[in-house]
Amino acid sequence: MMKEFLVEITTTIPNGTNPAEVNARRAAEAVRAKELAATGNLGRLWRPVGELRSIGLWRADNEADLHANVLDTLPLRPWMSVSVTPLEAHPNDPGPANPAT
């Protein structure tokens, strides 16, 4: 069973980067995100209103796997700063991870 992680990502495009490269990476990023969603690695993704960052629920076998085989495969990763917080279910979580017994 994969573990869950809260991942905050801020992407900063280096000054002077060719706009065509930016557009190509963004297009590739969208494709890769769909692939990671299909495998269950990307659960949810949000963008705070008025901010150029994302907050997501990501899944992987462990944190090393999350970095090496998930986040590091993102085309925009070289321009990202990433903060990862491992998560576990809260005893009062009403979600399906804690079915009534």
Annotate the PLM regions.
Residues 1-101:
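Conserved, structured core segments of small domains
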